[in-house]
């Protein structure tokens, strides 16, 4: 017998600080874009935060007279959010596995500037152990700054052929 809707307890938020979220990513400084996981539910959604600093190297030349955070870096932050949710929903990457971006369709509608706190709300569209599709909305102060639909593929390095590194 299930509880009536009014008797169900709301799900507690699950969060991660910077130190813990780094354990889910292979990226290291200066390529870790996320600062915090605000909430997540495996197989369903993740909500992450990125604080944009005026000291970010990418802003030095983009643009000197009026700093605008590059959309390519926003896409990387979204990808990192997806990588974390993908692993939380399936399993951690094995030592010889990587995630590759399969496809991206994005639209950015407002500039992101130093001092902005960007919230990424990423929702799972479909999920398999080796493939993940998602949609994401990026906001600053509750206003949309961009939307993205994408996919990730989990691959073993051995499956990708000989490597030059």
UniProtKB/Swiss-Prot annotation:
Active site per UniProt: 62
Keyword field: Lyase
Key word Repeat present: no
Top-level division of the source organism's lineage: Bacteria
Pathway where it operates: Phytotoxin biosynthesis; coronatine biosynthesis
PANTHER family hit by this protein: 3-HYDROXYACYL-[ACYL-CARRIER-PROTEIN] DEHYDRATASE
Name of the molecule in the record: Coronafacic acid dehydratase
Species of the source: Pseudomonas savastanoi pv. glycinea
